[in-house]
Amino acid sequence: LEDYIKIGIISDALRNYLLRLGWSYKDKEIFTKQESIDLFDLSGVGKSPSKLDMNRIFSINETYIKTIDEKDLFNFFKEYVLKYKKPIDQTKENVLLKSMGFLKNKAKTLEDIWNNAQYIINDKVEIGADDKKLIDDLSRKVIKDFASEYEKLSALSRESLESIIKS
């Protein structure tokens, strides 16, 4: 189990995958822990042998990442980072929590969220020489103003970002 968790599989998603190996309940694919307990019945166990399907594990994990409450997802992410990555500065945790809605969009694993969050986690963003030429004084001011307003947000959403951009 540790190897799956190490690559960023959420324990609840792995439990769901293991539950579905050889067992089914109607057309339902995703089960909460309580549903698993309430609905499991030996009559739903099939006779066919089961085989490991990593794509299916990633698919179930992605579903969990996309549908789980963002605070709960952040807690899974924080636990994952503390165990397998470097500690995150406390000041960045709030930004990560606010950004979880965006960070999870293209993620299938907690590792993907880690990779997607590097621009938040790392203090410095590398800007290439060609790109630096494109940033004039007005652009710097716009970026600083945006960053200042972004820090004040209590929750990150499309609407809140649009509001900052339009102001």
PLM-predicted stretches and their roles:
Residues 1-64, 167:
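Alpha-helical recognition segments enriched in aromatics with Gly/Pro capping
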Residues 69-167:
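Small-residue-rich helix-loop
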